[in-house]
């Protein structure tokens, strides 16, 4: 009887989906140690500031060094961050559909950290390929897709302009900051 009860509880727990708004279509695994990159680093400076977001892209240079390229929403300033410490070089980065995520603090819910895929969810669903980048618009409060002309509110992730399409919101990832490590994942 105890075994049957344990199996039933396990099945019920496995069937539950605590947060079905988290996208799992494209892998997201991002870790950033703010103690290694103090202010004025863009990613460190957005934390605790409602309405501040960064677009984060990754690439490896010709010397094999991984870099993060960030673009802030409120002034379009860019920064190139080299990840050179032993701890950083051992982390694998997966940034959604096309190596780009948007991460920041929503101004709608004080202190709520959010992360989105940097590609248009409707174009990812409607077309082949993965290169449908979102760009800052309206002083960084909207993310716009040039392909389908849809715009999304960066604070909520909800479509604010354009046809409804298949997705009314951006592809969303978990986001958390523990005081030192900034994470986004699915």
PLM segments and residue spans:
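A general structural-boundary detector
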Residues: 3, 106-107, 162
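Flanking scaffold residues of small Cys/His-coordinated metal-binding clusters
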Residues: 8, 112-115, 139-140, 170
């Amino acid at each position: 009887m105890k075994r049957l009860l344990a199996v039933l509880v396990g099945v019920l727990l496995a069937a539950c989906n605590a947060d079905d708004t988290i996208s799992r279509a494209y892998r997201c695994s991002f870790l950033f140690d703010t103690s290694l990159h103090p202010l004025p680093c863009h990613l460190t400076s957005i934390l605790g500031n409602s309405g501040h977001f960064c677009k984060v892209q990754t690439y490896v240079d010709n010397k094999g060094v991984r870099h993060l390229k960030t673009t802030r929403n409120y002034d379009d300033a860019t920064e190139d961050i080299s990840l050179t410490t032993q701890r950083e070089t051992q982390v694998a980065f997966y940034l959604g559909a096309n190596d780009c995520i948007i991460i920041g603090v929503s101004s709608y819910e004080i202190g709520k950290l959010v992360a989105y895929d940097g590609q248009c969810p409707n174009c990812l669903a409607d077309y082949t390929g993965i290169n449908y980048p979102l760009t800052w618009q309206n002083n960084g409060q909207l993310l716009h897709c040039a392909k389908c002309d849809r715009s999304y509110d960066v604070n909520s992730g909800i479509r604010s302009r354009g046809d409804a399409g298949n997705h009314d919101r951006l592809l969303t990832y978990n986001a958390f900051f523990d005081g030192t490590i900034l994470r986004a994942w699915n």
